[in-house]
A protein has these predicted regions:
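Glycoside hydrolase catalytic-domain context in secreted enzymes
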Residues: 1-566
Length: 566
């Protein structure tokens, strides 16, 4: 039997205590930092090696989105983990993290509807099954921190990120969030235990410009903290990601009141607290707290922020020096490292650090049951707001017009935080996702925009190719209708774009409706995280109306007195 921290018979906490006593200051600082190999760095193992000379706490896997073969995903994780363990004096493996809201950003992973869509179904049992699929697929690739559920209570539909949430009701968010957390954390997958990281703690959607929140204590606890409390109490939530905003003038990432007194002492949270991307740096650069980034980093550590992501800003060499010379109490750092190590032992990473290979890997992905769960979730997300006798359509109808930019492209089915969206953003002239810069794939190429707007169009060859690679079997609405109803003639017309006032397609579309027995209109914008989206992270709205061109088209189409479905 192994002695010391390698003894698997000891509880994770005890193993962590033993290992902590053996570690140097350099190795401890490595454990509270993350690394994000972005763009070209993702493929450069020598550069990745140089980024973590003493190992690392966490590794971002966002750029796995670029890999078009599942086997390459597993190989990348294994190669990077080997570097981490080689460089760490005690061969401590890294936690690999990935988003989990709509499925993994991995080739052949199962995709799911957004949080707001799944909330429409109010089905905790299904939510737990979704989480189990996400957990199985990410764990197979060596990923054990899953950045979901999104437990923000969102009461203003102009907020671009509302689509990620379960909506405005804390009871609903509590039920679904707890179910999702259970699905992620229960049982072992590939010899490992995955852990859920709920976000964004706290009252993020009750802030002004995502920066400052004036939320009274009672509202904070009874509404905004309720889903987090439920996940902690009912599902044993092991991970928290604080929000970017300040609460009553104090950045959440640097707030002892929020991250320790409320979260740990009152709510009973015992897991790991990791920063949102760039949040520790934002304490200094955006909120203007602390004379230096290191001082802001020290404040975040004292507040209870265990790991800085995605790269080192505040938990830096200057802060290390402060621990070295006694300016800062090393017991603060030790408390953080102890929680990180405990999580790694709890996850089983010391015994199972690498992604699966071969058939074992494929079994987690090529799974008919996962597809059925995805379909059921999509069906339950549908809401019929009004029906004045138009539905179901009469069988005597022989010709139906299908109008709108979403109808002839399956790309627009995939909103923010889906794999499709993240791959699309590698061809975006600008990223709106926090902590991630714009990409270079379209440099020196002519950029097509939605007429009359600054929104980059996805109706080009590059994005057609992405769909064929990502979801080769995914049919558009028009294709599905034609397949399901071969006896009916469907007339397609583009009609109008996802935003703006362009009316150039009206004549053709109105003519199609005039010739048809009924018309199906696809309405709304495109949800995402980059310059191709009309709503999403970093892309808010001034109102909740449809785009002007779509409003005008509906008014014009209604004059034709044909049944309209939108």
């Amino acid at each position: 039997m192994e002695n010391g921290y390698k003894n698997t018979m000891l509880p994770p906490e005890k193993r962590a205590e033993i290992l902590l006593k053996e570690m140097s200051l350099d190795e401890k600082m490595a454990q509270v930092n993350g690394v994000f190999p972005f763009e070209d760095l993702f493929y450069d193992m020598k550069a990745i090696d140089a980024m973590m000379p003493f190992g690392i706490g966490e590794v971002s896997t966002l750029e796995m989105r670029r890999l078009e073969k599942l086997e390459d995903v597993a190989k990348w994780q294994k190669d990077v983990q080997e570097i981490v363990m080689k460089n760490s004096p005690h061969h401590i493996p890294a936690i690999f993290h990935m988003e989990g809201l709509c499925g993994a950003f991995i080739q052949d992973a199962t995709s799911f509807p957004s949080g707001i869509g799944r909330a429409s179904g109010w089905d905790p049992e299904l939510e737990e099954q979704i989480a189990q699929v996400v957990s199985n697929q990410e764990a197979a690739c060596g990923i054990t921190h899953i950045l979901a559920p999104v437990l923000d209570i969102s009461r203003d539909s102009r907020m671009g990120r509302q689509g990620e949430t379960y909506g405005e009701d804390p009871v609903l968010a509590s039920a679904l969030g707890s179910a999702y957390t259970k699905g992620i954390q229960e049982g072992e997958k590939a010899g490992r235990k995955t852990e859920s990281v709920a976000k964004h703690f706290l009252a993020f959607h009750n802030s002004t410009a995502g920066t400052h929140s004036d939320t009274p204590p009672r509202l904070l606890q009874e509404i905004y903290a309720k889903p987090f409390q439920a996940a902690i109490t009912e599902a044993g939530l092991k991970g928290i990601m604080p929000c970017y905003c300040s609460i009553d003038g104090v950045p959440a990432s640097a707030s002892y009141e929020i991250l320790t007194k409320l979260l740990r002492d009152e709510m009973g949270f015992e897991g790991v607290c990791i920063s949102d991307y760039g949040a520790v740096g934002n304490v200094h650069n955006v909120h203007h707290v602390g004379e230096t980034a290191a001082e802001a980093g020290a404040m975040c550590m004292k507040a209870g922020m265990d790991i800085e992501l995605p790269n080192t800003t505040g938990y830096n060499a200057e802060l290390k020096k402060k621990f070295e010379n006694g300016e800062e109490d090393s017991a603060i750092l030790d408390a953080l490292v102890l929680r990180v190590l405990t999580a790694k032992f709890r996850m089983g990473l010391f015994e199972h650090p690498f992604a699966l290979q071969g058939e074992e890997l494929k079994q987690a992905f090529y799974n008919e049951e996962a597809r059925k769960i995805s379909l059921r979730s999509a069906m339950e997300s549908l809401v019929l707001l009004k029906n004045d006798g138009t539905l179901p359509l009469k069988k005597t109808m022989k010709k139906i017009a299908v109008i709108g930019p979403h109808a002839n492209s399956a790309r627009k089915f995939f909103g923010g935080y889906t794999h499709m969206c993240m791959v699309e953003s590698t061809y975006a002239i600008e990223n709106s996702i926090a902590g991630v810069s714009g990409c270079k794939n379209l440099e020196n190429k002519e950029i097509v925009v939605v007429p009359g707007t600054n929104i980059q169009s996805d109706e080009t060859e590059e994005f057609d190719r992405i769909l064929k690679v990502q979801k080769p079997e995914c049919r558009s609405l028009l294709e599905e209708l034609q397949m399901q109803y071969p006896e009916t003639e469907f007339i397609y017309a583009y009609g109008y774009p996802i935003a703006g006032e362009d009316e150039s397609g009206f004549e053709e579309a109105l003519q199609a409706i005039e010739e048809a027995d009924a018309a199906i209109l696809t309405l709304g914008g495109k949800h995402g995280t980059c310059s191709m989206a009309s709503m999403g992270e970093g892309i808010d709205a001034s109102d909740i109306n449809l785009p002007g061109c779509q409003d005008k088209f509906i008014f014009a189409a209604s004059k034709l007195k044909k049944p309209l479905i939108g």
